[in-house]
Design a protein with these regions (language model features):
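Amphipathic alpha-helical packing segments from all-alpha helical-bundle domains
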Residues: 72-75, 102-105, 121-147, 157-158
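Short amphipathic alpha-helical elements of helix-turn-helix/winged-helix folds
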Residues: 23-27, 98, 102, 136
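Hydrophobic alpha-helical connector segments
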Residues: 65, 76-105, 156-159
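Generic hydrophobic, amphipathic alpha-helix propensity
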Residues: 13-24, 41, 62, 66-70, ...
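Short linear capping/connector segments at secondary-structure termini
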Residues: 80, 113-121
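N-terminal intrinsically disordered/low-complexity leader segments
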Residues: 1-15
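Hydrophobic/aromatic-rich alpha-helical bundle segments in the mid-to-C-terminal region
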Residues: 111-115, 145-159
Length: 159
């Protein structure tokens, strides 16, 4: 007979994963990557340390997922703002201004996401979102060049 997870078990497993990710984000916000330990994450999530490793093979994998979740949220906010702006110039200004304001509200987390030294897996996730944000900015600059909001000065050559 094949084991089949009940809806209740599936819900509990998903809840545990969310609790782990939320706890990790909270602790990284307080102390960065280097100061955050898996045992502390587990305790904050109300789980055993070993349970964390059922969901994530390593601390670096967990942190890469935290970085990806937070970065995706920030990228979505910037994209929504840019898309809702009346023109590319306003979109670029408002998106960057919002990004900076949000980063300043949680400087420790922003430093971890943007610049804190980290493991290769975390840095790979970081680069994915740097490219996505630069792509959004380039889209706005290109649109602004087409509509005359920005001068054409070979911005692409710098990227």
């Amino acid at each position: 007979m094949t084991y089949r997870q009940t809806e209740r078990v599936v819900t509990r497993l998903a809840d545990n994963r969310t609790r782990i990710l939320d706890a990790a984000r909270q602790l990284v916000s307080q102390g960065g990557w280097a100061e955050t330990q898996v045992a502390s994450i587990a305790a904050t999530a109300g789980l055993a340390t070993g349970t964390v490793y059922r969901y994530f093979a390593s601390k670096a994998e967990l942190f890469a997922e935290v970085l990806a979740r937070v970065s995706q949220q920030e990228l979505a906010v910037m994209t929504d703002i840019a898309n809702g702006a009346p023109n590319p110039h306003a979109g670029l200004h408002m998106a960057v201004q919002t990004f900076v304001k949000r980063a300043m509200r949680n400087r420790r987390l922003a430093y971890a996401l943007i610049a804190e030294p980290c493991e290769r897996e975390i840095d790979a996730a970081r680069l994915t979102y740097r490219h996505a944000i630069s792509g959004l900015i380039m889209r706005l600059v290109n649109a602004g060049q087409r509509d005359g909001s920005f001068r054409t000065s070979g911005a692409r050559a710098r990227w």
